[in-house]
Design a protein with these regions (language model features):
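Blade-edge beta-strand/turn elements of extracellular beta-propeller
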Residues: 30-49, 84-101, 145-168, 202-230, ...
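Blade-level signature of beta-propeller repeat domains, shared across WD40, Kelch, NHL, RCC1
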Residues: 357-383
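Hydrophobic core register within WD40 beta-propeller blades
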Residues: 56-58, 110, 178, 228-231, ...
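Residue-level signature of beta-propeller blades and closely related beta-rich strand-turn architectures
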Residues: 72-73, 128-130, 192-194, 244, ...
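Beta-propeller domain segments
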Residues: 27-32, 67, 105-107, 137, ...
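Residue-level detector of Asp-centered blade-edge/turn motifs that repeat once per structural unit
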Residues: 60-63, 113-118, 180-183, 233-236, ...
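Beta-strand-rich domains and repeat architectures in extracellular enzymes and scaffolds
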Residues: 43-75, 299-306
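N-terminal Sec-pathway targeting helices
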Residues: 1-12
Length: 383
């Protein structure tokens, strides 16, 4: 496989946000930051269809090994070794009949519950197409993986199936981000799936919500979400990133019982008069839980990770990094405290970032929609 090393000097625009009230940021300072970006081709796990392409889902194991999810059929798991840049196919998480030939029908996230020797227990989320009812639901399945010479993926059961099953529309709004709490519990995001009745609280059912899920129990934590493509747990605080319409992308601190406003309010704007839903109020979040930070215009946020406490990351140690699609950048987010955002810094990487992880050695690992894996490190501290 092709291995390419790129050293990029990234000019970072730092935006200083003052106060607790969410605000559109303005440029306050400019810092030079050298990011070392190593680019590796991962063609086996790259999702490619007649309708487009999508980067692989990624989850860290150990010893610089990862699980990748995707492939040509969207539903395959791979063992990836970043030292050798080797992808080994392990098996399928669902049948080909559970998807359409569409890059959106692919593994959305992987959560590693436990690993011992050549075996691991994981949960995997994906949108499933029902060919009889011609509708789509988000699934969270439980699997045991064997990494040995006879690799295998065994399904143990289904932890979650979203209801209602809705007509195929904005499948990209499935969300499906997983944050592992412990060996038996995870948080799971569910978007609105482009459901035309999303403004009807009874009809929308599970859609637009965040759940705590185990093998035997599903608990709704919050609602009013559009498409939460990033999630990270910092201590007991849960943060998500969320797509708004034509702007209004959000960073949220999740509170139990919170309503985050969609589709009633957004800081973004409707796409057109014929869109599947029209918000009641734009440019506002009155009455509902406000985001910690929002972006206008849109950056199209994806996964969230927390940088480790290592000297190489300097003042950014223990802070949040967010991937983006439209912006093709990593966004560094300073938390002054659990509810207050400080500097927000955008670092251009020139790729649509689908998923993020942190390596054993503290580097940022990113998968891209072009079928690459980026290993990103800081070569010097910010002043």
């Amino acid at each position: 496989m092709r291995r390419q090393v790129i050293i990029w000097v990234v000019i970072i625009i730092a935006s200083l946000i003052l106060g607790v009230i969410p605000n559109i940021s303005t440029n306050a300072d400019t810092h030079d930051l050298k990011l070392n970006i190593e680019s590796l081709a991962i063609p086996e796990s790259h999702v490619t269809t007649s309708t487009g392409e999508r980067g692989a889902a990624i989850a860290r194991l150990n010893n610089e090994q990862y699980l990748l999810g995707g492939g040509k059929g969207g539903f395959a798991l791979y063992l990836y070794d970043s030292k050798s840049n080797d992808e080994r196919r392990l098996g399928q998480i669902a049948s080909a009949g559970a998807r359409l030939d569409d890059s959106r029908f692919a593994i959305t996230d992987i959560g590693v519950l436990s690993k011992k020797g050549n075996r691991a227990n994981v949960v995997v989320s994906y949108p499933r197409y029902d060919r009889v009812r011609k509708c789509v639901s988000l699934i969270l399945g439980s699997y045991q993986i064997n990494f040995g010479a006879k690799s295998a993926v065994k399904r143990n059961g289904t932890w979650f199936t979203s209801n209602p099953c809705v007509p195929v529309g904005a499948v990209q709004h499935a969300a499906g981000r997983i944050e592992v709490i412990d060996r038996k519990n995870v948080y799971l995001t569910l978007g609105d799936l482009g459901f035309s009745k999303i403004n009807d609280e009874q009809a929308r059912g599970d859609l637009g919500s965040l759940f705590k899920v185990s093998k035997s129990k599903v608990l709704k934590i919050s609602q009013g979400h559009r498409n939460q493509q990033g999630i990270v747990l910092i201590g007991s605080d849960l943060y998500t990133s969320e797509h708004g319409p034509r702007g209004g992308d959000e960073l949220n601190l999740i509170t139990k019982g919170g309503d985050y406003g969609w589709p009633a309010v957004t800081y973004g704007e409707p796409y057109s008069a014929g869109d599947y839903v029209k918000p009641t109020a734009t440019g506002s979040h009155e009455v509902f839980t406000k985001p910690l930070k929002y972006w206008v215009p849109s950056v199209a946020p994806t996964e969230l990770v927390v940088l480790p406490e290592v000297e190489a990351w300097g003042e950014w140690s223990s802070q949040i990094v967010m991937g983006t699609l439209r912006e093709e950048a990593l966004i560094f987010i300073e938390l002054i405290d659990r509810t207050t955002v400080g500097q927000v810094v955008s670092a251009d990487v020139g790729e649509r970032i689908r998923d993020l992880e942190i390596s054993d050695s503290g580097q940022i690992i990113a998968t891209t929609d072009s079928g690459k894996l980026l290993i990103i490190s800081s070569s010097r501290r910010l002043p």
